Amino acid sequence: MAEKRNIFLVGPMGAGKSTIGRHLAQLLHLEFHDSDHEIEQRTGADIAWVFDVEGEEGFRRREAQVIADLSEKQGIVLATGGGSVQSKDIRNHLSARGIVVYLETTIDKQVARTQRDKRRPLLQVDDPREVLENLAETRNPLYEEIADVIVKTDEQSAKIVANQIIEQLGF
């Protein structure tokens, strides 16, 4: 890989973007970044606090700035937030500045992977499955729209998925 290409991971919460991203970056000797973690670093607060104080709109503004900044770098793997693709500007940034990999997963797997995670503000409701179904309906077409590669993450370990991505990208 002569040119340092960026790899942007998109997909719903619970797809494994952060875990797979770390493995992928390590295997390819690239920097790993997580947009949610970067927001927390910049604000000095967790995502739930940002949602509580600034609402989803404030969070999305911060997310757009973080992704714009990070996507300017070269040679990174970036795990994006599940809702980041709702912004046309973010979709354009990602498409123009690297390879977009959509990590696809089922609602059942999302529920299993996120059920005990209290750091996901959108799922702190009585019926998280319904929320995930509604999000999938609006977001999945957006993930597909910008994806250069689609990889299913349900039945594989993060290491195996990272290797599948490398294989599909021809690295």
From Swiss-Prot:
InterPro entries documented for this protein: P-loop_NTPase, Shikimate/glucono_kinase, Shikimate_kinase/TSH1, Shikimate_kinase_CS
Which pathway does the record list? Metabolic intermediate biosynthesis; chorismate biosynthesis; chorismate from D-erythrose 4-phosphate and phosphoenolpyruvate: step 5/7
Gene3D superfamilies in UniProt: P-loop containing nucleotide triphosphate hydrolases
One GO cellular component this record assigns the protein to is: cytosol
Any keyword Amino-acid biosynthesis?
yes
In the Enzyme Commission scheme, what number(s) does this protein have? 2.7.1.71
EC class name:
transferase
Compartments, record wording = Cytoplasm
Query: Which annotated residues bind Mg(2+)?
Result: 18
Q: What family does the Swiss-Prot or TrEMBL record give for this protein?
A: Belongs to the shikimate kinase family.
Summary of the function given for this chain in its UniProt record: Catalyzes the specific phosphorylation of the 3-hydroxyl group of shikimic acid using ATP as a cosubstrate.
- Name under which the protein is recorded: Shikimate kinase
Source species of the chain: Shewanella denitrificans (strain OS217 / ATCC BAA-1090 / DSM 15013)
Species classification: Bacteria, Pseudomonadati, Pseudomonadota, Gammaproteobacteria, Alteromonadales
